[in-house]
Amino acid sequence: MGSFSTITASFLLFLACQLLWQTGANPVYGSVSNADLMDFKNLLDHLEDKMPLEDEVVPPQVLSEQNEEAGAALSPLPEVPPWAGEVNPAQRDGGALGRGSWDSSDRSALLKSKLRALLAAPRSLRRSSCFGGRMDRIGAQSGLGCNSFRYRR
């Protein structure tokens, strides 16, 4: 939200400068009264008072307290014991992950059935264009389509 208020304040300041410099350029807008300018200046000052300074220096003590609070919030996490670097024979075969009980024929049959279902799905039919059928016909005639190929004679 700080950048939005900075942009707003900058825009208001720009408008104030434009109003001050425009006195002779356009007679319709050049007749701004001093009361209007003072109201605008008060509004701008009020906005600047509400806007926090972005260059505030935070003391290191406050930062360390915030880090301690964040560390305290993370402390209820369970401790994980370090890995010893040894692998059980069941893990080497894939049994720990639930993959060891599958035969290769079962796996290949499942993959084939999934591939057939994927290829037979109506959304996976090969489309030859990136814009649709009508644009593809126009592109094929003009040579400007996505997948249009002109054969040279």
From Swiss-Prot:
Protein's UniProt keywords contain S-adenosyl-L-methionine: no
Matches recorded under InterPro entries: Natr_peptide, Natr_peptide_CS, Natriuretic_peptide, Natriuretic_peptide_atrial
Keyword Nucleotide-binding: no
Regions crossing the membrane: none
Signal peptide annotation: 1-25
One Gene Ontology CC term in the entry: perikaryon
Propeptide, chain numbering: 26-123, 93-103
Post-translational modification: The precursor molecule is proteolytically cleaved by CORIN at Arg-123 to produce the atrial natriuretic peptide. Undergoes further proteolytic cleavage by unknown proteases to give rise to long-acting natriuretic peptide, vessel dilator and kaliuretic peptide. Additional processing gives rise to the auriculin and atriopeptin peptides. In the kidneys, alternative processing by an unknown protease results in the peptide urodilatin.
Keyword set, alphabetical order: Cell projection, Disulfide bond, Hormone, Phosphoprotein, Secreted, Signal, Vasoactive, Vasodilator
Pfam families membership: ANP
Site-annotated residues for Cleavage: 123-124, 130-131
Annotated segments matching region Disordered: 62-104
GO biological process entries: cGMP biosynthetic process; female pregnancy; receptor guanylyl cyclase signaling pathway; regulation of blood pressure; vasodilation
Phosphoserine modification, residue list: 129
Family: Belongs to the natriuretic peptide family.
Protein's name in the database: Natriuretic peptides A
Originating species: Felis catus
Lineage: Eukaryota, Metazoa, Chordata, Craniata, Vertebrata
